[in-house]
Regions:
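N-terminal, active-site-proximal structural segment of metallo-dependent hydrolase catalytic domains
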Residues: 1-127, 296-298
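Soluble catalytic domains of enzymes that build or remodel membrane lipids, polysaccharides, and related
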Residues: 86, 92-106, 117-303
Length: 303
């Protein structure tokens, strides 16, 4: 048991230090700190000296502390709902219960809703009635865009090697002081695919295809929050959860969410008033809800 504990802690530390920069270490980076806590306690129980028992108990406390203080899967409190609301949902591939999906979207009533694998939901009467006669659902590759705000641009950016990215520009001048450009992203989930190579490929495409200014990047990245690969794709954006997260943070899988693989990254000029996840009651992913505000200089000018 002591050997297993040492190996487990060693692999976990490798994942913390090297993250997913290498294919071999990315497996280690998926080890949740909280999984190490019971392992360390078992090692403490198996230790043959008081000193070793104390040592393993301290390591167990450290892993639990890391989980709650660094990984921060839970944050108390509530944010403000007075702002531009954005929902991202990586939907299931199941098309058999479109009305249930649509009802959840309508009930949420976000200003901007971006779906991955939206498929038949966008054609339901529930969605069309909710949007009203002056708006329509937009299909953009893997993605569905639902909003009553003026959509200024829908642009394909990347689609190959199971890497999908699209640019969406929406006129939010009244709400945020300027339009926002959103990069909707869906990246491979295969565990053996190098996350670092995926990130490098997407970053290269963004540069070569002149993606322009990106204010928000969102979607199913299949990378953990804090991933080195994730940070390398959009180095100028920060995680909305880091700025204003509340409640339970992980988004997958829905029944027992342990990992945050769906992300909303935002530019510094945007104010983040709240970032939460919610259980839609269907599918594999929790939904992400973000409340945004404009920059301070815009607010000051309006006053």
């Amino acid at each position: 048991m002591l050997t297993i504990g040492c190996v487990g802690i060693g692999l976990w530390l490798v994942g913390i230090i090297l993250s997913d920069r290498f294919t071999a270490t990315q497996f280690c980076s998926w080890i949740p700190a909280i999984a190490m806590t019971p392992l360390c306690l078992l090692a403490a129980a198996a230790a043959r000296s008081r000193r070793l028992t104390t040592c393993w108990c301290l390591i167990a406390a450290m892993t639990a502390g890391w989980w709650f203080l660094v990984d921060q899967p839970w944050r108390p409190g509530e944010g403000s709902s007075d702002g531009l609301t954005l929902m991202q949902w990586t939907m299931s591939h199941d098309k058999s219960d479109r009305v249930t999906h649509a009802d959840y979207i309508v009930e949420t009533d976000a200003d901007i809703t971006i779906l991955t694998h939206g498929y038949g939901v966008r054609g339901t009467d529930e969605i069309r009635n909710w949007l009203g006669p002056d708006a329509k659902p937009y299909k953009l590759g893997f993605f569905t865009v639902l909003t009553r705000l003026p959509v200024r641009q829908l642009r394909p950016l990347a689609a190959g090697m199971d890497i999908h990215a699209r640019i969406i520009e929406i006129d939010t001048t009244r709400q945020l002081g300027r339009p926002i450009r959103i990069a909707a992203v869906d990246l491979p989930s295969k565990l053996t695919r190098s996350r670092w190579e995926i990130a490098r490929t997407l970053r290269t495409w963004l540069d070569e295809r002149d993606a322009g200014r990106i204010d928000i990047a969102l979607g199913d990245f299949n990378m953990r929050r804090g991933s080195a690969a994730l940070a390398s794709i959009f180095p100028d954006l920060t995680h909305a959860w880091d700025r204003a997260g509340h409640g339970w943070g992980p988004t997958w899988n829905r029944r027992f969410p342990l990992y945050r693989i769906d992300h909303v990254l935002v530019a510094d000029w945007l104010g983040v008033l709240d970032c939460t996840t919610h259980d839609p009651g269907i599918g594999w992913h929790l939904t992400q809800h973000v409340v945004l505000d404009g920059p301070r200089e815009v607010d000051a000018a309006e006053d």
